[in-house]
Regions:
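Short, solvent-exposed loop/turn and secondary-structure capping segments
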Residues: 19-24, 88-89, 110-113, 161-163
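Histidine-bearing beta->alpha loop at or near hydrolase active sites
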Residues: 155-157, 181-195
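Solvent-exposed loop/turn segments at secondary-structure junctions
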Residues: 14-18, 81-83, 105-108, 154-158
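Structured alpha-helical segments in the cores of large, soluble enzyme domains
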Residues: 54-63, 135-142
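Cap/lid segment of the alpha/beta-hydrolase catalytic domain
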Residues: 1-56
Length: 195
């Protein structure tokens, strides 16, 4: 991308890579070092939802880019948890024109293996009570000149191999067609065994 003069902003998921694993004080529990997204449920409070930790950094960075630069389009790509973030964030911010989720999520009815259940953010009932994955896929794809592509690794060593994705691809495409704008596509890569 850089060779083609694209500007690239790279981010990592909470608690991963350059992000720290803080020690937090939780009422009634004491100090806990956060090492896993599964612990984020412990941070839930009346005035704070840990889901913000996944999407707010994207919003802050996108707002900065929009203020400081004159880009015509914004694209977003994410792998695994970043693929999940790509689905959710592009569903709520129409500034994302092209979104590519790689091994990032699957509808709940396809999660029949423990390895596909996902972390806190993947199964947070407060979010999915209001909007399910199929609706998130529609929202990610819907809009003028907007595209959402799901990419699955057929022989994925981790999760979300894309098996069963054909059961909903036509549903999403049909809904996008009814709405009259947007594009949705699924691509299953069978060329490797990696995540």
């Amino acid at each position: 991308f850089l060779d083609r003069n694209f500007t690239v902003l790279a981010m990592t998921m909470p608690l991963v890579g350059m992000n720290n694993q803080p020690i937090v004080e939780i009422d009634g529990l004491g100090e806990i070092k956060l090492i896993s997204h599964k612990q984020f449920g412990l941070l839930e409070e009346k005035n704070f939802n840990p889901m913000k930790l996944f999407v707010h950094p994207v919003q802050i960075n996108l707002n900065f880019l929009e203020k400081e630069y004159n880009f015509k389009r914004y694209s977003m790509i994410g792998l695994s948890g970043g693929g999940w973030t790509t689905v959710v964030y592009s569903a709520i911010d129409e500034r994302i024109s092209d979104s590519f989720s790689v091994a990032g999520s699957a509808p709940f009815y396809l999660r029949v293996d423990d390895r596909d259940m996902g972390d806190y953010e993947q199964i947070n009932i407060d979010l999915y009570r209001d909007v399910n994955y199929l609706e998130l896929y529609v929202l990610s794809a819907y809009g003028d000149d907007r595209n959402h592509v799901q990419i699955f690794n057929k022989n994925d060593s981790c999760c979300f191999s894309g098996s069963g994705s054909g059961t909903y691809e036509f549903v999403i495409k049909d809904k996008i067609s009814q709405l009259g704008k947007g594009n949705f596509q699924i691509f299953v890569d069978d060329t490797h065994n990696e995540h």
